[in-house]
Amino acid sequence: MIPPFEEIDIKSLLPQQPPFVMVDALLDYSEEKTVTALKVQEENIFCNNSTLSASGMMENIAQTCAARLGYINKYILKNNRILVGYIGAINNLTILREPRVGEIIVTTVQVLEQIMGMTLIQGTIKAGDEVLAEGTMKIAIAE
């Protein structure tokens, strides 16, 4: 049986481990869409001048993809494999604003296409209703 999202330890879905974890919670999963949350903390390795850097925002999107894959493997395929993914390309990334320490960001990854171990996604980061960043990313999965 699949537990409710709030009972899932997101670190159990990721290959990354602290201090490199850039997602706090899995909020939603479907075949096409995954949603995570992160509270921006001052001690985050990607924080500079009390904001999460663009690099941290890109890693947050990539780790939302990793959480999606971990969820599929653990709860749907039930094989408990944690696969490593690599950012193959980032396109049309627009950073409108870097999130500030204390803000909770919600990241949505929409799967656009999957083929031969590559996944093309559209990622969007919001703080409340405000879009902070959006763009597409290709993720390659190492087998």
What are these regions (language model features)?
Residues I2-P4, L69-V106:
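Hydrophobic beta-strand-centered segment that forms part of the acyl-chain substrate-binding groove
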Residues E7-Q17, K78-I82:
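Short aromatic-glycine motifs in intrinsically disordered, low-complexity regions
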Residues Q16-M22, V101-V106:
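Short coil-to-beta-strand transition motifs
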Residues P18-S53:
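Catalytic strand-loop segment that frames the active site of acyl-thioester-processing enzymes
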Residues V23-D24, I90, L120, E134:
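Hydrophobic residues on conserved beta-strands that form the core of alpha/beta folds
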Residues D24-L27, N91, L96, Q110-L112, ...:
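Conserved positions in beta-strands of structured domains
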Residues V35, A67, R100-E103, Q110-E143:
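HotDog/MaoC-like acyl-thioester-processing domains
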Residues S53-K78:
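Active-site helix/loop of acyl-thioester processing domains in fatty-acid/polyketide metabolism
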